[in-house]
Structures are given as structure tokens and as C-alpha cells.
């Protein structure tokens, strides 16, 4: 089955392709079709994921999977949340976002730097699908005091997994996929799709 992935984020394309290996599902990035980015003007992860999936399905005529995800920091009342990709401004510069978040927490004790990655994933059979399949995953951790690790993307270098004392950028892609919010959401989504 071919499904368009509603993102221009190469890290997400790579991560989801790895997670879907062996399922019989082929992910085609929306960039292969020249699909413009959807305007993410929803007020929640669910709304933004649906907007992105509808946009990709409408432009390609294919079923679509979209996710909206972000990091929620308890000491910042859940921010950056849905604004995670553009926390430091438009353009989605991951290093700038990480610097801004570290600066916002520079006087916050390690024990108070709890955070979670949250992912909402949506599947639409077509652009007018009235019954989107929605799945959610979350990954608890804390914000490190500095960026560490060569892997991952986005906030991974500053998201620390307390039981490992490593950031998401310091663990293997396979370990990350096993633990991550996106991996959880995709596994739930696949279970729900098989039940349809």
C-alpha cells in the first residue's frame, strides 16, 4: 500500500520509513509530489495533524499519514507545545530552538526540568475522509543542561531519558524507535488500521 507522508521534515520521513519497514506500507514523502506545506493554524496537535493529512491527500489523491508533534516542558507550562518547530521563530531551526529552550531553563533545577515529547498521528483514506484514524504517543523525560549526541533531529540532543542518562540523540535509531512518542503513535495507528 502506498501512503503519502504529509511532511517535508527529512528526519520524520527517515524515522517513519524505518518504523514501517516490513509492513507492506510504502511511505512517499509529499515532496515527491510537490505538495505545498499545510498552514498549521490549529490549536492542538490533533487539529494540525488533520490539516496536514487533508492537504497531502487532496494534492496527491493518495491516503495520507500526518503527525504533529512537539515537546512540552512542565516548568514552562507545557510550552513550546504545538509551537515546537517554530519556537525560536519561523523556519524551524532546530539548533536555535534548542538554544532558546536551554536559555529558558538555565536557572531551573534538573529535577524540575521534566518534559515529554508528544505525537498525534492521523491517517486519512482520502481528503474528505469523515473518520480520521487518530493515535497518540508520549515519551517522558527531562531537558538536559546542554545538547549532547550526534543522532536524531529536532530536540533530541537536549531530551534526556532519565533511566539511561542519555539524550535521544545519544541512543541508536532502533532504541529511539522502540521508545519514542512517534514510534508509540505509529504502532497504535497500525493496530487501529488493521482493525478497520
UniProtKB/Swiss-Prot annotation:
Documented EC number(s): 3.6.1.66
InterPro entries the record matches: dITP/XTP_pyrophosphatase, ITPase-like_fam, RdgB/HAM1
Cofactor(s) in the UniProt record: Mg(2+)
Cofactor note: Binds 1 Mg(2+) ion per subunit.
Reaction catalysis annotation: XTP + H2O = XMP + diphosphate + H(+); dITP + H2O = dIMP + diphosphate + H(+); ITP + H2O = IMP + diphosphate + H(+)
Active site: 68 (proton acceptor)
Membrane-spanning parts: none
EC primary class: hydrolase
Keywords: Hydrolase, Magnesium, Metal-binding, Nucleotide metabolism, Nucleotide-binding
MF terms (GO), sorted A to Z: dITP diphosphatase activity; ITP diphosphatase activity; metal ion binding; nucleotide binding; ribonucleoside triphosphate phosphatase activity; XTP diphosphatase activity
Residues that hold substrate according to the record: 7-12, 69, 153-156, 176, 181-182
Residues given in the record as Mg(2+) binding sites: 39, 68
Taxonomy, superkingdom: Bacteria
Pfam families with a match to the protein in the record: Ham1p_like
UniProt record similarity statement: Belongs to the HAM1 NTPase family.
Record function comment: Pyrophosphatase that catalyzes the hydrolysis of nucleoside triphosphates to their monophosphate derivatives, with a high preference for the non-canonical purine nucleotides XTP (xanthosine triphosphate), dITP (deoxyinosine triphosphate) and ITP. Seems to function as a house-cleaning enzyme that removes non-canonical purine nucleotides from the nucleotide pool, thus preventing their incorporation into DNA/RNA and avoiding chromosomal lesions.
Summary of subunit composition and partner proteins: Homodimer.
Protein name per the record: dITP/XTP pyrophosphatase
